[in-house]
Amino acid sequence: MKITWLGHSAFRIEIGKATILLDPFLSHNASFSGQDIKHVSAGVTHILLTHGHGDHVGDTVALAKETGAVVLANADLAAWLGSKGLDRLEMGNTGGTIALGSFSATFTNALHSSAQITEDGVSHALGNANGLMLHFEDEASILAMGDTDIFADMALINELHQPDIGLVPIGDRFTMGGAVAALACRRYFNFKTAIPCHFGTFPIIEQTADKFVAGMEGSKTDVKALKAAESLSI
């Protein structure tokens, strides 16, 4: 398994026959600047979306049309994407598990909102914000928390799914900050590896992973604070 952080909450995950883009906010992502969209989208089989905000949907429509990738999203967001011309859509909702060939994805809870703002400035709700629990046969499992604050039912997510790897938002203001994210990981999860994300993209969110790294000191979790475009093989 190879996980590449593309900046913000965007990841490329390569495993077996699957090449996944998660929340592919790329062309307007300052952290992605200097990377090649065609390179990171090459061979993509699936695009997975945690919720409908622009900094997560990102380049989904263009990339899905270009690559033919299957797009997974909550039902409301999937319907909206269908209106944009996408037809290879897998939709679900909180608690549902979708089989996607060599892996499965379960929609978990997240404390956040989900919407798109149209040109007239109106915000249109697009279902629930979610995390995504990814299970691969005979490989480490991944919980992409999505955008969220800490909540006690994270313990149930851990009990049900036992995720090995956590993709953890730490930027504050729109999600939990680094110290709270560390508390969430230590109290509710038994991650073998935690990768912080959703930081450093905009001036108004945390610029480094320092608070998260400090909060995780002494835990059994291996924290990998990647640089944009940096990869981790597991």
Curated annotation (Swiss-Prot):
GO terms for molecular function: hydrolase activity. InterPro entries: Metallo-B-lactamas, RibonucZ/Hydroxyglut_hydro, UPF0173, UPF0173_UPF0282_UlaG_hydrolase. It comes from the Bacteria. SUPFAM superfamilies: Metallo-hydrolase/oxidoreductase. SMART domains: Lactamase_B. Keywords: Hydrolase. The keyword Hydrolase applies. Belongs to the UPF0173 family. This is UPF0173 metal-dependent hydrolase Rleg2_1519. The lineage of its organism: Bacteria, Pseudomonadati, Pseudomonadota, Alphaproteobacteria, Hyphomicrobiales.
